[in-house]
């Protein structure tokens, strides 16, 4: 590890993704035939860890490996990335899901839960937390009714760790009291348009994100899709970071790729704006490839060109 790099603790799940392409999203009592696009290991945390590893950022692995077919594949892919397995479940396999995708990139997910809800104090205590660095977690874990120990563990994490939280579509299920208890001075929230509306209020994304940052004290990264992202920090003018235009294959894992790229930049000591720009670049590459596993290596990032 380079001395200038700070470690990133990645906490969450690895899931099996079976990606299907359908002509339109399904309705009751209808029959459709789907095209199988791929079978991949995904999951928010694993997607973030994969992006970090490919960009050679130091990762502390807080992702469960299950006991089953998907668990074997997760362990193999972790080994290929150079990630040491730290959490194993003795009986349950990893979660897996169908990702059903329309030609325009819109998709729905059907998930089969696995070992990813076993966040007990004794297991969390085995994750080696650095005194300085970053700690990533997603809303899929934070919203789980069994995740009380996990939420408290995050709140009790070392003061030198910046929490980078991507609530995702489970934001609606996360206890507002937990969000209010977060240490605002060291918490960064990454949200897409829908999540900004849910957390900050309906209306113009930038206006609402800026207001929330000023009133609540959080730093927000408001991801606005093909337009790029806004950085909203308390009592500061928002900063716009434009997107990179590419031919889109699908949007699976785009938000995870953005978080991974941004965290890689922060780990290297980049300014927040430059780190968000790196997140935009990594996300652009991922959406130009099928599925969520297209995070670039350093060489691929250097060779990246836009349309």
Language-model-derived ranges and their functions:
Residues 92-95:
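Short acidic/glycine-enriched loop/turn segments that link adjacent beta-strands
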Residues 52, 192, 255:
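Short, conserved phosphate/pyrophosphate- and ester-handling motifs at nucleotide-, phospho-/glycolipid
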Residues 1-64, 69-73, 248-249:
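Glycine-rich phosphate/adenosyl-contacting loop at the front of the ribokinase-like
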Residues 2-8, 205-307:
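Conserved phosphate-binding/catalytic region of the ribokinase-like
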Residues 51, 77, 265:
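Rossmann-fold NAD(P)-dependent oxidoreductase module
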Residues 1-14, 75-89, 102-240:
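Ribokinase/PfkB-type carbohydrate-kinase core domain
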